[in-house]
């Protein structure tokens, strides 16, 4: 009887242990998946798959906003309706429609409505009441609840660097703590090695990517040869030869008939870097807006460059230690001009620097269609700004340049990539390679500080900001990783990529 009681006790203890292990396993699985998904409440104005372009808050809040004042409403730009005899075809948006009305033309099943289609600042486009409600669910408790895995990542990376890991150890022997990261971090590790693919993405991001591919909003049809085994030198020369920097110069319709030749700067962007007594920029810094740049202490290093490129509404004030203070040129997407909440007319971050704007256009480069139905109405605000601030250099990138960059990515990728323009980051990198002798890019490929924090100046978390959904981000970053001339230690510790300027390359035709 005593022997059977002992067996019974062992059985009970074994059952308790089994249940404890099962509970811990389920808890670990639940926490990993919570990190993978962005935390957004039901009814939030943040889109289900907020990627790095359009905010779904536009859909409900912009109808209450005042139209952006600009030349679009004046007689000059309105004359395009009569001078060309072109009324927008059925299904094509009229330029007079507000962004809030634009979404009504997009089928409810469209990924451009579900996931978004422009890079933006997630918080800044919410009204204060909505922002307060959203923050109470989505970001106020991030540090204690949502981003547990990110805290583990930061502690792991701090441990690695405090132990003074040698250069040769970094790329090959990654700490076991880092190896236990979530799926998004495993993708970043493959990004460091240049071996990333869409099969490594989470189901959520793969689904968003496939939806964009199937929607093909810009009617992309790529029939050219793909070669994925180019050497770094071959890839650099392909970039130099096939990505010809170009801006809207007013010489093509519909811009020529509207007198845009009088609005655009006399100095082409291609020669912008020669304005300092004929000297080009020797060193340039491209500073991404990624959350990983926080606590980097890279500010002084960034400011030591001859020219510094920043993106969209990324500020320097309050973040000087990490991002520096100097801004020479800023690339902005069309939402910055069109959405009053970005304060394009009044904010000091857009003043006393060179501005370069861009907006998606059809792959066929139909400029009339683009002018009639831009993703966001940048044309009116652009002309108004040029009239009021003629002394400031301000350009709009030509759609042909954007799609040349997209072709470049697809031609070096065996997989079918998202048929949407590259990110502002990739556009900025290639633009500065055309203007500078040497380039340092910070946190475009994330360092060991990698986090799901989208932008260093916002409290919003989503892996899509690093890995992409709308933009072919993983493929862009794979290309930049392949041409990196810097050390692995610089990449992992600083998030710094070193690239040559096109002017320093010797390439055949």
From Swiss-Prot:
Gene3D superfamilies: Glycosyl transferase family 29. Residues 42-123 are annotated as: Disordered. Disulfide bonds join 237-507, 284-436, 454-465. Keywords: Disulfide bond, Glycoprotein, Glycosyltransferase, Golgi apparatus, Membrane, Signal-anchor, Transferase, Transmembrane, Transmembrane helix. Its EC number is 2.4.3.1. InterPro entries: Glyco_trans_29, GT29-like_sf. It catalyses: a beta-D-galactoside + CMP-N-acetyl-beta-neuraminate = an N-acetyl-alpha-neuraminyl-(2->6)-beta-D-galactosyl derivative + CMP + H(+). One of its GO terms (molecular function) is beta-galactoside alpha-2,6-sialyltransferase activity. Transfers sialic acid from the donor of substrate CMP-sialic acid to galactose containing acceptor substrates. This is Beta-galactoside alpha-2,6-sialyltransferase 2. It comes from Oryzias latipes. The gene is st6gal2.
